[in-house]
C-alpha cells in the first residue's frame, strides 16, 4: 500500500528552488472534462480507466510517458482527474527533483500547484498533507513542512509514517528532543526504516525508551530472592513419587 515505507524509498534526492504557488489564479481551478474525483472513494472502473491509460508503471517510475513524450504529461492528466491521487503526487514531486525543474516537462503548473490543488479539492485528506509536507522538507521550507505534517497528524493520528516524517522535520530543524519523541512514536508502531534513528545516533541524541513500569517491576521481582514461603508450589516441593530416584530433578 502506498502509505507504507515506500514513500521513504521513492523520494528522489536534490533540492529545487521553490516559491509559493497557491490558489486558482496561480494553479488553475479544479474543473475538468473527466472528474475531478476523490481517489479515496472513486470507483474501480474510473481508477482503472485513468491508471491504465495514463498512470502506468513506466510513468509512475518516470521511465517514459504513455500518451505523451514526457511522464509529466500523463501524471498531469492523472492529477487533473484525481487531484488527491497519492502515488501520482509523489511521482510528480520526484519528477520535479529528477529534472531539477519547478514545472516538469509536460506539466501544466509548477509542482507545488499540484499539492495546492489537492488540498483545495479535499482538505480532509491527511496523505495529501503528508506528501506536501515531504515536498516542503525537500525544498528547505521546514517550518511550513511541520505545519502540514502536524495538520495531517490531527486528521490521521497514530500513523507511523506521519510520526516518522515529523521526526525528520524536527531533526532538520535541530529540535532533537522533538525528533526523538516522534521517532519513538513511529518505531513503537513498527515503522521499518531506520534512517531517523541513525540520524539521531550520529548527533548523540538517540535514547532508548525505558521499559514500561509494569515490565520494570516484573524484571526486579524476577531478580530478587524469594521470601520464605512465598515461592509458588512446584512438583519439587510436592512428595516425590515412589518411582523417582534421588538423582531425578522434578520439572517445575
Over which residues does each language-model region extend?
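Canonical tetratricopeptide repeat
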Residues: 91-94, 131, 165, 199
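N-terminal leader/linker segments that initiate helical-solenoid repeat arrays
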Residues: 18-74, 81
Amino acid at each position: 500500500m502506498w502509505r507504507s515505507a515506500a514513500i521513504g524509498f521513492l523520494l528522489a534526492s536534490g533540492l529545487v528552488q521553490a516559491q509559493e504557488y497557491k490558489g486558482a489564479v496561480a494553479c488553475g481551478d479544479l474543473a475538468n472534462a473527466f472528474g475531478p474525483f476523490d481517489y479515496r472513494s472513486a470507483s474501480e472502473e474510473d481508477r482503472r480507466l485513468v491508471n491504465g491509460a495514463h498512470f502506468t508503471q513506466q510513468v509512475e517510475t518516470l521511465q517514459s510517458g504513455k500518451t505523451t513524450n514526457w511522464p509529466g504529461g500523463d501524471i498531469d492528466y492523472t492529477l487533473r482527474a484525481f487531484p488527491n491521487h497519492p502515488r501520482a503526487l509523489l511521482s510528480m514531486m520526484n519528477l520535479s527533483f529528477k529534472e531539477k525543474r519547478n514545472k516538469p516537462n509536460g506539466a501544466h503548473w509548477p509542482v507545488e500547484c499540484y499539492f495546492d490543488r489537492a488540498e483545495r479539492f479535499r482538505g480532509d485528506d491527511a496523505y495529501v498533507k503528508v506528501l506536501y509536507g515531504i515536498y516542503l522538507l525537500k525544498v528547505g521550507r521546514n517550518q511550513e513542512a511541520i505545519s502540514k505534517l502536524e495538520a495531517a497528524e490531527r486528521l490521521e493520528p497514530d500513523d507511523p509514517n506521519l510520526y516518522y516524517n515529523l521526526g525528520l522535520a524536527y531533526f532538520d530543524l535541530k529540535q532533537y528532543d522533538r525528533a526523538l519523541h516522534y521517532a519513538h512514536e513511529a518505531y513503537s508502531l513498527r515503522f521499518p526504516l531506520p534512517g531517523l534513528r541513525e540520524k539521531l545516533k550520529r548527533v548523540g541524541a538517540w535514547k532508548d525508551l525505558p521499559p514500561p513500569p509494569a515490565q520494570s517491576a516484573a524484571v526486579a521481582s524476577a531478580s530478587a530472592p524469594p521470601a520464605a514461603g512465598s515461592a509458588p508450589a512446584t512438583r519439587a516441593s510436592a512428595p516425590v513419587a515412589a518411582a523417582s530416584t534421588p538423582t531425578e530433578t522434578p520439572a517445575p
